[in-house]
Amino acid sequence: MTEIEFVGYSAVHPSDFIYDVPNGFTGYLLLLFDSPSELLIDGRLMRTAANSAILYTPGSRIYYRAAGEEYRNDWIRFRSDHSFVKLFPLTNTPFPVTDPEYCHQLFKLLTWESAFFSSESEANITHLLRVLFSKLREGIQNESPG
C-alpha cells in the first residue's frame, strides 16, 4: 500500500531557502532537484547538480538548501510497503536523473491523482510511483561503472 502525505511540483524558493528536519519523517521523502542544491550527507555539506534526485528513508536527517540561486524542485512525502520503494538501490544519497522532464510529468500526475481522489486513485498512484522509481533507477544504473 502507498499513502501520499504531501506532493508538489515546480516548487520555487528564494536563494536563501533552507529545509532542515533533524529526525526525518516517519515515511519517505523523494526530491527531484531542478536547480543546483546543497545537501548535508553523513555530516558533510555537498553540492548536487540540477537534474538530480534523492530518496530519504524514514527517520533519516533531511537537510537541503539553495546553492546561491533560486531553488526549484518536485517532491513527494509518502509511506509505502512496496518492494520497488523499500529495495531502491540508492537512498539518502543524491543521484543523477536521466530523463528529468519525464519524471517531472510523473510528479504532476501524482499531484493530480492525489488531489482528485477516486475509486482508482490508490492503484493509479502505485502504478505512477512504480514508473517513477523505474525511471529513477535508470540514472543510478547509467552512473554505475561496467
Language-model segments: residues:
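A short, structured beta-strand-centered segment in the mid-to-C-terminal lobe
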Residues: T91-D99
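N-terminal regulatory/effector-sensing and dimerization cores
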Residues: T2-N92
